[in-house]
Amino acid sequence: MKNYHAPDEKGFFGEHGGLYVSETLIPALKELEQAYNEAKNDPEFWAEFRRDLKHYVGRPSPVYHAARLSEHLGGAQIWLKREDLNHTGAHKVNNTIGQALLARRMGKKRVIAETGAGQHGVASATVAARFGMTCDVYMGADDIQRQMPNVFRMKLLGANVIGVDSGSRTLKDAMNEAMREWVARVDDTFYIIGTAAGPAPYPEMVRDFQCVIGNEAKAQMQEAIGRQPDVAVACVGGGSNAIGLFYPYIEEENVRLVGVEAGGLGVDTPDHAAPITSGAPIGVLHGFRSYLMQDENGQVLGTHSVSAGLDYPGIGPEHSHLHDIKRVEYTVAKDDEALEAFDLLCRFEGIIPALESSHAVAWAVKNAPKMGKDQVILVNLSGRGDKDINTVAKLKGIEL
């Protein structure tokens, strides 16, 4: 796929994306777009971004050959891009550093964020502390219950965590509340969106901050094995870790790209979070147009995933576009497959992955045995699993 260019000047990736917000937010988004376009062309902005990624986040994150897991499965060699080793334990901080630098550049003193698994909330609270800003994090009440360690981490970092009791009490509702708050306090507040979704320019901006993942991986794989992987795979909720890995590979036609949605209890049940794989129609949510789980009246459907971070009814607009143009394959891993992959990575490699990332590992577990021993799968290990210990223990019937 040569000459890939997206989004267009209106923020559309094909027919997805755009700017579907109340009139009160248009000036704020235009201000943000202008500030980002200026920052994008300022070498000093990127120099500071790279400095913080190196000295504060600890980048580059390594690539690691999961040799024992590969041997156990028999087939393709599995390599992991270790985003779990970043400061705060996931890929989220790549984006929050970038957006916090932009907020400071715009003179904003307060940041707000939404969070599902709590990783983006922790990463936002972290950069707010780092740059001396106040921080409010909106989190669904159900997610607060399943992610208590991260809630406490956010509070330790000085953030105010606001529980959201409306709707499904998960990520979608947290995002609704954060957008409402942004409308009310747009003058002094910067909204750090945590995924490659939302109204333009967020999907492009988040991608640009996250593609450090794929850029590093390309150089590292070349050094490690003398070529690029046959397949690059990542889990997809809103899709920021996936677009960060995929974007630098889009024009590399010999690298197959696979996005793994949350299959929950199966896409033939209502209990999943897989808009593309389940064939969901296009809809509008949180200011952008994309494939969206909805009923015949356009009402957003409930979702289910064992991982809070994938529990979202929509998907970032660039992913919908990459599906439409057939550059990326989207598929699912079910809850039980993700849990099996979680166990395998713990036992064979001594790495406890996030349940989100376990969905990508599950694809490798399922497909590596069907591939040749000389083939290579690169899995984006987007986060570590400390936050999921309680969830996994509960599912195994273990009292902690």
From Swiss-Prot:
Post-translational modification N6-(pyridoxal phosphate)lysine, affected residues: K92
Pathway assigned to this chain's UniProt record: Amino-acid biosynthesis; L-tryptophan biosynthesis; L-tryptophan from chorismate: step 5/5
Entry EC no(s): 4.2.1.20
GO MF annotations, alphabetized: tryptophan synthase activity
Enzyme kind, highest EC tier: lyase
Superkingdom of origin organism: Bacteria
Keywords annotated in UniProt: Amino-acid biosynthesis, Aromatic amino acid biosynthesis, Lyase, Pyridoxal phosphate, Tryptophan biosynthesis
Gene3D superfamilies per record: 3.40.50.1100
Keyword Transmembrane helix: no
Needed cofactors: pyridoxal 5'-phosphate
Gene Ontology annotations for the cellular component aspect, listed alphabetically: cytoplasm
Reactions performed catalytically: (1S,2R)-1-C-(indol-3-yl)glycerol 3-phosphate + L-serine = D-glyceraldehyde 3-phosphate + L-tryptophan + H2O
Entry-linked Pfam families: PALP
InterPro entries: Trp_synth_b_CS, Trp_synth_beta, Trp_synth_beta/beta-like, TrpB-like_PALP, TrpB-like_PALP_sf
CDD domains: Trp-synth_B
Subunit annotation: Tetramer of two alpha and two beta chains.
Family membership noted in the UniProt record: Belongs to the TrpB family.
HAMAP family per UniProt: Trp_synth_beta
Known function: The beta subunit is responsible for the synthesis of L-tryptophan from indole and L-serine.
Protein name from the UniProt record: Tryptophan synthase beta chain
UniProt organism field: Neisseria gonorrhoeae (strain NCCP11945)
